[in-house]
Every structure is written in C-alpha cells, then in structure tokens.
Amino acid sequence: MAWFKRQEKGITTATEDKMDVPKGLWYKSPTGKIIDADELARNLFVSPEDDFHVRIGSATYFEILFDNNVFVELDKNMTSKDPLHFVDTKKYAERLKDVMEKTHLKDAVRTGVGKSKGRELVICCMDFAFIGGSMGAVVGEKIARGIDHAIKNKLPFVMISKSGGARMMEAAYSLMQLAKTSVKLAQLAEAKLPYISLCTDPTTGGTTASYAMLGDINISEPGALIGFAGPRVVRDTTGKDLPEGFQTAEFLLEHGFLDFITPRKELKDKINLYIDLIQNNDIR
C-alpha cells in the first residue's frame, strides 16, 4: 500500500513479531563512551575509556573490600516504623514497602563485619537506590551500632556515604541522626580507633554535614558530587554562576576538604594502607 493511502502513520509491527533485546548488554557513560556490560562489571563498574565511576551499591562495595566477599551483616532486619504517619504523594509506609520489594533492601545502609587484607574491620555502606540513600532513624541507628561494635571489638571503622541527605518523611527524627552519629564517632576517636570516610557519588545534605566529613582520613572516588545543597539550589539562591567543577571531588580536594581521591580499583589497598598507618601496623 502506498504511504499516502495508509490509515495510520508510522510502521506497525505485531507484538509477537518484535525482537526482544535484553537490557543491560551495553552501558553508555555520560561522555558517550559505549562499553559491554559484562566488561564493565569485570572492571568494577568503571568505564575503561573515560574512567567514569558508575554508581554501585553496598553489595558491590562489600565484594570489593571484604576478603572473598565473606562478612557478617549486623542488624540486617531493622526497618523504619513510620512514627509520624507521614503522607506526601503516597503514604510513607507504602513507599517503604514498595522500595523494599524493588531493591531487596531493608533501608539505606548496611553494616558488614569481616576481614579485609586479612584484618577485621567494620564497614557501613549506604545504598542510593533506597529512597535516594536518605538518612532516617534506621540509618543513624545502624551506623551507631556499627561504631559500637567497632569500639567493643577494637576494630577500624569505614563509612561509605552515598546519599541525598536527611529523609524528609521522618523530619526531626532524621535530623537527630546527625548528632547521634557525630557523638558516636567522637567515642570512636576517644577509643583511638581509625575512621576512614569514603564519599561516593552523590554525598550531599545531612550526610556531608555529619559523618561523611568527620573521618580521620576523608577520601572520595573520582568525579563524585559532594556538597551540602545541590549546585542548582546554590545557584538559584545566590544568583551567581558557580566555579567550574564546583562540588566535584576534584574541586574539594583542591580546596582542602578531602585528603585523597582514590580510584575504585585501589580502594581496598588504600583503605587498608591508611588504617595501617594510623595504627602504626606493618603495611600490608
């Protein structure tokens, strides 16, 4: 049939005749580089051509840092109880249920205890997939308990931050976690135990205003967004153009807010090096 006689525009194909292309075969970085998904995974989710660090969750960080991915998870079934009965576009309780089913996570942080390069340590790692890695009562409590475990067992503590900040659905309960976690880190310091803080993309809001910037050594992955308010909010509030690269890890390193930028492939070696140096141990 000639195109000018067609009743419908475009090309139509019966559903049963369409080709199903599996998702995840290829990944396109923000700079336009294309990489095979399997190769990306083998490269620890770092694009080899432009060194772009793809966001990963706690499961992958634990696999990278713990020897043979062997660890014990603390408080893994702790969940929020919606004390304010908060409702926005949907009930907070329903939102929690939906995101738990989608992510298979209980909240936005997990705590693991295991060996890294042969020595035991405690790692708390945030998951951005769970309501933007927002910090609520469960996040604060799990971090506090992780620090308590480190103090009790005289272990180094590592915090991996990846968060949009405080969880608005928990209001003051969320803001209380800034003080709680900061006090616990002060207790860790009194016990003379190392605290390594790793900021990943993005680390913003209340996390930056509390535990993310309180490490004995503060490090970051390349290119991570780190700040309090986001760049757009700062620009709209001040009415001024921001410096190039504002709130990137590289900008913060240049201005003294970070100690080191560490590529993902070097994280395990570097974190353990910093711990050994702080504790005056033999370098592993």
From Swiss-Prot:
Lipid metabolism as a keyword?
yes
InterPro entries annotated for this entry?
Answer: AcCoA_carboxyl_beta, Acetyl_CoA_COase_Trfase_b_su, ClpP/crotonase-like_dom_sf, COA_CT_N
Cell compartment(s), UniProt: Cytoplasm
This protein's UniProt keywords: ATP-binding, Cytoplasm, Fatty acid biosynthesis, Fatty acid metabolism, Lipid biosynthesis, Lipid metabolism, Nucleotide-binding, Transferase
Biological process GO terms, please?
A: fatty acid biosynthetic process; malonyl-CoA biosynthetic process
The pathway to which it is assigned is: Lipid metabolism; malonyl-CoA biosynthesis; malonyl-CoA from acetyl-CoA: step 1/1
Q: Can the keyword Lipid biosynthesis be found in this entry's annotation?
A: yes
One cellular component GO annotation, for this chain's record?
acetyl-CoA carboxylase complex
Molecular function per GO = acetyl-CoA carboxylase activity; ATP binding; carboxyl- or carbamoyltransferase activity
EC number, UniProt record: 2.1.3.15
Q: Which family does it belong to?
A: Belongs to the AccD/PCCB family.
State the oligomer form and interacting partners.
Acetyl-CoA carboxylase is a heterohexamer composed of biotin carboxyl carrier protein (AccB), biotin carboxylase (AccC) and two subunits each of ACCase subunit alpha (AccA) and ACCase subunit beta (AccD).
Annotated HAMAP family: AcetylCoA_CT_beta
Its function, per the record, reads: Component of the acetyl coenzyme A carboxylase (ACC) complex. Biotin carboxylase (BC) catalyzes the carboxylation of biotin on its carrier protein (BCCP) and then the CO(2) group is transferred by the transcarboxylase to acetyl-CoA to form malonyl-CoA.
What is the protein's given name? Answer: Acetyl-coenzyme A carboxylase carboxyl transferase subunit beta
